């Protein structure tokens, strides 16, 4: 049995887990981010997924994680130590990423954003804007030399849809889809239009303004749970890479084994 690498991206909404053999992503699953869920519960879910994929737990003794949810960081460390006899490498201070962070306070930058930057720096060299669409949508900018120079943070598309439903008396919760037309013929279709096409406007305008400040048209890479859906209605992206964060974790793990 060949050794495999487990890459775990713990976000506010979901936990993205990838299994690598070398550079090949063999399997990819998403679990809900539930701070109250016990390590035993997550272990049971993961072991079931591994069994279904035909992957033996004994092969998984290399693990790397990044997290924006501290309680779940602890939970998943326990999962891998107790059930896989593996001590995860957690992306944070002291971990090599290859990314020079040029921010007022580098420690403020989320681990997931550094991981995305590490992936883009290797996979798509040169000036780059990474648009990661999840609970929040982040716009991360790399210089021509691959340094992380900042960006922007906006509410995610699902977060926006949830907020308008919760903060109004009569507007319902909606499914986020790509509408056939902009002019909605009822309340739901009007909301879907406003959320979807309005969000495309937000993304495109922020990308253009970042490029204007940089003084050049850069490569734009989209990732995150809503990347493919937004890319259906926009030509602003050069690359759509849903597994960018997992690839960044793989790259950082290899970098820290040298």
Curated annotation (Swiss-Prot):
A monovalent cation. Ammonium or potassium. It catalyses: (R)-pantothenate + ATP = (R)-4'-phosphopantothenate + ADP + H(+). It is found in: Cytoplasm. Pathway: Cofactor biosynthesis; coenzyme A biosynthesis; CoA from (R)-pantothenate: step 1/5. K(+) binds at residue 132. CDD domains: ASKHA_NBD_PanK-III (cd24015). The active site is at 112 (proton acceptor). Substrate binds at residues 110-113, 187. Its main location: cytoplasm. GO terms for cellular component: cytoplasm. Keywords: ATP-binding, Coenzyme A biosynthesis, Cytoplasm, Kinase, Metal-binding, Nucleotide-binding, Potassium, Transferase. The keyword Nucleus does not apply. Transmembrane segments: none annotated. ATP binds at residues 9-16, 135. PANTHER family: TYPE III PANTOTHENATE KINASE. Homodimer. Catalyzes the phosphorylation of pantothenate (Pan), the first step in CoA biosynthesis. This is Type III pantothenate kinase. The gene is coaX.
